[in-house]
Amino acid sequence: MSVTRDDVRHVAQLARLDFSEEEEARMAEELSEILGYVEKLDELDTAGVPPMSHVLDVTNVFRSDEIEERIDRGQALEPAPDADNEHFLVPQVVE
């Protein structure tokens, strides 16, 4: 598949990016090479390869949940610079 500078311009516009003409030309060439490689992958015979969600055989490495003693809300809020009885209070950052 060949990527044109118009294709690059269109995608750049969607992503709100601005490229020079040299950058557009370089990206069109590089993307064409990448898509050419992907097309080569389509030629591979994968009939005997089982579907997988991960390249490596990964198992669950998470620990099991254990109930632990926890601090109460008052202790958690105590070091906060500003809090009410239930919440941390922070300055407004978005108007």
From Swiss-Prot:
One Gene Ontology molecular-function label: glutaminyl-tRNA synthase (glutamine-hydrolyzing) activity
The keyword Heme is assigned to this record: no
Known role: Allows the formation of correctly charged Asn-tRNA(Asn) or Gln-tRNA(Gln) through the transamidation of misacylated Asp-tRNA(Asn) or Glu-tRNA(Gln) in organisms which lack either or both of asparaginyl-tRNA or glutaminyl-tRNA synthetases. The reaction takes place in the presence of glutamine and ATP through an activated phospho-Asp-tRNA(Asn) or phospho-Glu-tRNA(Gln).
Enzyme class at the top of the EC tree: ligase
Protein's recorded name: Aspartyl/glutamyl-tRNA(Asn/Gln) amidotransferase subunit C
Family stated for the protein in its record: Belongs to the GatC family.
Species in which this protein is naturally found: Salinibacter ruber (strain DSM 13855 / M31)
PANTHER family: GLUTAMYL-TRNA(GLN) AMIDOTRANSFERASE SUBUNIT C, MITOCHONDRIAL
Keyword Nucleotide-binding listed: yes
Gene3D superfamilies: Glu-tRNAGln amidotransferase C subunit, N-terminal domain
Pfam families per record: GatC
SUPFAM superfamilies: Glu-tRNAGln amidotransferase C subunit
Superkingdom field: Bacteria
Species lineage: Bacteria, Pseudomonadati, Rhodothermota, Rhodothermia, Rhodothermales
Alphabetized HAMAP family for the sequence: GatC (MF_00122)
Stretches for region Disordered: 74-95
Keywords: ATP-binding, Ligase, Nucleotide-binding, Protein biosynthesis
Residues spanning the membrane: none
InterPro entries listed in its UniProt record: Asp/Glu-ADT_sf_sub_c, GatC
Record-level GO BP terms: glutaminyl-tRNAGln biosynthesis via transamidation; regulation of translational fidelity; translation
Protein EC: 6.3.5.-
Enzymatic reactions: L-glutamyl-tRNA(Gln) + L-glutamine + ATP + H2O = L-glutaminyl-tRNA(Gln) + L-glutamate + ADP + phosphate + H(+); L-aspartyl-tRNA(Asn) + L-glutamine + ATP + H2O = L-asparaginyl-tRNA(Asn) + L-glutamate + ADP + phosphate + 2 H(+)
